[in-house]
Amino acid sequence: MLEVKNLCKKFNNRSILKDISFTLKDGEIMTIVGPSGAGKTTLLRIIAGLETKDSGEILIDGKPYDPGNVGVVFQDFNLFPNLNVLQNITLAPTMVLKESKAEAEQNAQKLLDQLQMNGREKQYPYQLSGGQKQRVAIARALAMNPRILCYDEPTSALDPNLRKEVEKMIWDLKKSGLTQLIITHDLTFAKNVADQMLKVQPLSEA
């Protein structure tokens, strides 16, 4: 279970997040919605360990959490253009988790099969559609065995017709027991996938 308690963040003395609190149970999906400037992506970056908080607590199962337990699927996917699909997925497990190449490739293949991307192992990012790049980015994040998977605007870079496909993929991952946190401005999508929704608004005070 992920708990965020009274999280605050300022940039240049301007409050971006103030006293944000929520609880996300294991296996649930939370969407965080709000307009641009509301601090949604900043909140995700703090939870993922990519940004520091000014105050507040982040706990997993009641204990201070390790950002290594959190995977992120970035809005523009951030795939390495010079690596093929399989290499993109296996790079971090071999370097960070010290998995053998064979083990990392076996796990990557399972993830690609799960995400219906088998047969594309040797392709490069430029050969993939936006939806396919997203699936590779998800597989890459899952290869690190995260407790929680975060998405930054998962529908924004895709054709609107693919929204239902993304919804199904997120629900399929939920069935496997994965806890998911989704930043989005797409209210319809947010309502369709969420067990719970957190609405954030821009803060006007300095």
Task: Write out the residue ranges for each language-model feature.
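Helix N-cap at the start of a conserved alpha-helix in ABC-type nucleotide-binding domains
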Residues: 160-162
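The feature captures the beta-strand-to-loop junction immediately N-terminal to the Walker
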Residues: 33-35
